[in-house]
């Protein structure tokens, strides 16, 4: 009986049908980018100072320039270590009193302005930006600055819950295309733009996370199931590269639309176009076969043949899953991930790699917004380096193997973060170059750890293993905002110290995994154990054929 891969070899492994489905699903990957990293623009914190009643009138009466107004009325202006008093405290002075002069108005109140009492910003803030963000609208600064971190953490909590929930729905209840939820992603993106208060914004952000990553994962799985074996690696990498296209588009869109509500609408409304694509993506024939819906699977394979201009094989009606030859099916259990010594080691290492890849990836993106340069250009530069990262993977993965590429990329990202610690604040361009190098390294890690995870687990717990390990990626995204923004307040280089340590340790731990290049996917836990003892690629095996002499007289 032919399998799906056997039929694809005859009707086209990457023909017109697959290309059309690939393009449609890539739109989902593009649309996911603003949700994943939109915090850089939605939560941008501009320079700010306390609003003091009477200052504007006094400045106008005295004819002060902006620099003079700040010098006379804002405490702690100047020294780098005085950011908190400058942005979060005000002089407790009645600026409306007539005794204040225009030349150093505070001189008559105290010999030194540092002796004047300071108070909280009870009248709000003045923000030095022509646009707006959730920070400027809801005053998420000073003592409330942690609420920006919570805003980003909420979407990652949604990723964590939603990816498992939609994965369960896709596997248990409906087909992959039916679980592909761009309509819900669009509906839940629009309320963000009209949220009346901060609490409502958090709720909508959480709900958006529930469906958005599941949408991306469903598309990833679906397109790899439609193409032949020889195209799966390339298609998977290019699907993730479409996410990078979304990053580039986001930087230009954020520059053109500097107001956060309008930006949120701009990135949500185009998802309506995905509704048109939704009807052109059928269910996965592999999933249909696993649900014993062979007739529907055969119809879809026949449709693929017609779209590709090929004739379906004569034995198409006997289409089946390769797994059907197995008479006994094992039931996966969470404990199976830790059942043996090698499997335990691989699981813990992969969990750490998923966690660190998320922390470094999101951390480097958010760190760009805290460096003080051109937010839009810096974001664009760091997004562009993801394209050569995909090219590097396609070029050398089959030549050098998985482990060296995974370990080397982790070490590169960690070393780049370590180097950034010692770069002077005046050399902003050098800091961006180092950040881009680190970003390229961690982008490679993100794509490689997904591949290695799938290749190390035996078949009956492969989906479970990848799901559990990748959930650490979402947990990393939950803590990353707090690590970046709160540690930066202590010392600008402190997040980089942590990122460097995580990346360098991850590089060393990657070498403890077995090489899977050219090795058949393990079917049982016993095969995983043998893989750990001697991870010899199939390409290095030598087969000898012994020809026996023919018996005499024949």
From Swiss-Prot:
- Means of activity regulation: Phosphorylation of the transporter leads to changes in its substrate affinity, resulting in a regulation of the transport activity. In contrast with rat ortholog, ASP uptake is inhibited by protein kinase A (PKA) and C (PKC) activation. ASP uptake is also endogenously activated by calmodulin, the calmodulin-dependent kinase II and LCK tyrosine kinase. Inhibited by cGMP, most likely through a cGMP-binding protein that interacts with OCT1.
User: Which GO CC terms are listed, alphabetically?
Assistant: apical plasma membrane; basal plasma membrane; basolateral plasma membrane; lateral plasma membrane
InterPro entries referenced in this protein's UniProt entry, alphabetically = MFS_dom (IPR020846), MFS_sugar_transport-like (IPR005828), MFS_trans_sf (IPR036259), Orgcat_transp/SVOP (IPR004749)
Carbohydrate attachment residues: 71
Q: Which SUPFAM superfamilies match?
A: MFS general substrate transporter
Chief location category:
membrane
Q: Which reaction does it catalyse?
A: 1-methylnicotinamide(out) = 1-methylnicotinamide(in); dopamine(out) = dopamine(in); serotonin(out) = serotonin(in); (R)-adrenaline(out) = (R)-adrenaline(in)
Q: Where is this site: Involved in affinity and selectivity of cations as well as in transport activity?
A: 450
Which family does the record claim for this protein?
Answer: Belongs to the major facilitator (TC 2.A.1) superfamily. Organic cation transporter (TC 2.A.1.19) family.
Task performed by this protein: Electrogenic voltage-dependent transporter that mediates the transport of a variety of organic cations such as endogenous bioactive amines, cationic drugs and xenobiotics. Functions as a pH- and Na(+)-independent, bidirectional transporter. Cation cellular uptake or release is driven by the electrochemical potential (i.e. membrane potential and concentration gradient) and substrate selectivity. Hydrophobicity is a major requirement for recognition in polyvalent substrates and inhibitors.
Name of the featured protein: Solute carrier family 22 member 1
Organism expressing this protein natively = Sus scrofa
Gene name on record?
SLC22A1
């Amino acid at each position: 009986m032919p399998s799906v891969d056997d039929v694809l070899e005859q009707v086209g492994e990457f023909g017109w049908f697959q290309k059309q489905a690939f393009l449609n699903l890539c739109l989902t990957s593009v649309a996911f980018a603003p949700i994943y990293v939109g915090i850089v623009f939605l939560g941008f914190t501009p320079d700010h100072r306390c609003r003091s009643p009477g200052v504007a009138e006094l400045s106008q009466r005295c004819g002060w320039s902006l620099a003079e107004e700040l010098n006379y009325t804002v405490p702690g202006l100047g020294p780098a270590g005085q950011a908190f008093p400058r942005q979060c405290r005000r002089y407790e002075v009645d600026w409306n009193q007539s005794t204040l002069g225009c030349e150093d108005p505070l001189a008559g109140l105290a010999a030194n302005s540092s002796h004047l009492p300071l108070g909280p910003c009870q009248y709000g803030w003045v923000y030095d930006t022509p646009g707006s963000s959730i920070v400027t609208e809801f005053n998420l600064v000073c003592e409330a600055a942690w609420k920006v971190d919570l805003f980003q953490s909420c979407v990652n909590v949604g990723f964590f819950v939603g990816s498992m929930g939609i994965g369960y729905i896709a596997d248990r209840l409906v087909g992959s295309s039916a679980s592909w939820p761009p309509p819900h992603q669009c509906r839940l993106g629009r309320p963000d733009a009209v949220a009346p208060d901060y609490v409502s914004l958090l709720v909508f952000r959480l709900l958006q996370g529930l469906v958005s990553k599941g949408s991306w994962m469903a598309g990833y799985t679906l397109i790899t199931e439609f193409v032949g074996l020889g195209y799966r690696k390339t298609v998977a990498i290019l699907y993730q590269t479409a996410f990078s296209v979304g990053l580039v588009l986001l930087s230009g869109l954020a520059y053109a639309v500097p107001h956060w509500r309008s930006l949120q609408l701009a990135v949500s409304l185009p998802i309506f176009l995905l509704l048109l694509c939704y009807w052109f993506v059928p269910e996965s024939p592999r999933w249909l076969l696993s649900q014993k819906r062979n007739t529907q699977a055969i119809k879809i394979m026949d449709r693929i043949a017609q779209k590709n201009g090929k004739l379906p094989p004569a034995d198409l009606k006997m289409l089946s899953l390769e797994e059907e030859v197995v008479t006994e099916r094992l039931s996966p259990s969470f404990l199976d991930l830790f059942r043996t010594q090698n499997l335990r080691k691989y699981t813990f290492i992969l969990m750490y790699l998923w966690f660190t890849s998320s922390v470094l990836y999101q951390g480097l993106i958010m760190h760009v917004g805290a460096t003080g340069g051109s937010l839009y250009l810096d974001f664009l530069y760091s997004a562009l380096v993801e394209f050569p990262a995909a090219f590097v993977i396609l070029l050398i993965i089959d030549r050098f193997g998985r482990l060296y590429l995974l370990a080397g990329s982790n070490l590169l990202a960690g070393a780049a973060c370590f180097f950034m610690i010692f770069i002077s604040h005046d050399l902003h361009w050098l800091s961006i170059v180092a950040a881009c190098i680190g970003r390229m390294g961690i982008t490679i890690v993100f794509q490689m750890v997904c591949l290695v995870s799938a290749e190390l687990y035996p078949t009956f717990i492969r989906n479970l293993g990848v799901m559990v390990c990748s959930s650490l990626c979402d947990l990393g995204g939950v803590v990353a905002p707090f690590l970046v923004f709160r540690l930066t307040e202590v010392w600008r280089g402190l997040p980089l110290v942590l990122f460097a340590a995580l990346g360098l340790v991850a590089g060393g731990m990657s070498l403890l995994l077995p090489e899977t290049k050219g090795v058949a996917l393990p079917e049982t836990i016993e095969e995983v154990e043998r893989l750990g003892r001697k991870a010899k690629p199939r390409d290095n095996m030598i087969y000898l054929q012994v020809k026996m002499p023919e018996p005499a007289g024949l």
